[in-house]
């Protein structure tokens, strides 16, 4: 990467989702190809990696809370969840407020359906977060 930062994926799985087809291709979310696959670790090992890191980047998840508890800056990508829901105020929260966002307070989430968008807008809340928005937050940290 351009910033010469090693990126590790420490999620539970290297891919997830229900595999619903998009066209003829099963759709799964996969870890970024440029990251080092450290998925499937115990919480303790994940905590060790976080503790040694400069910062943590993730979604609204238990690992983000763990990083926060370990006093690491958390670059958090938000879509359907409100920006005041986590570690507020945080200078490293990323949310595109020019599109649909913060809808999960208005609906009963269907956690069993990976492709359920509460506003039926195909998750524009996260799709419209640009690499530039992410890089801007990371630049504040390094």
Describe the role of every protein-language-model region.
Residues 46, 52-53, 135-142:
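Extended amphipathic secondary-structure runs
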Residues 27-30, 68-141:
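Nucleotide-sugar donor-binding patch of glycosyltransferase catalytic domains
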Residues 1-84:
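Donor-binding and catalytic core of enzymes assembling or modifying cell-surface/extracellular glycoconjugates
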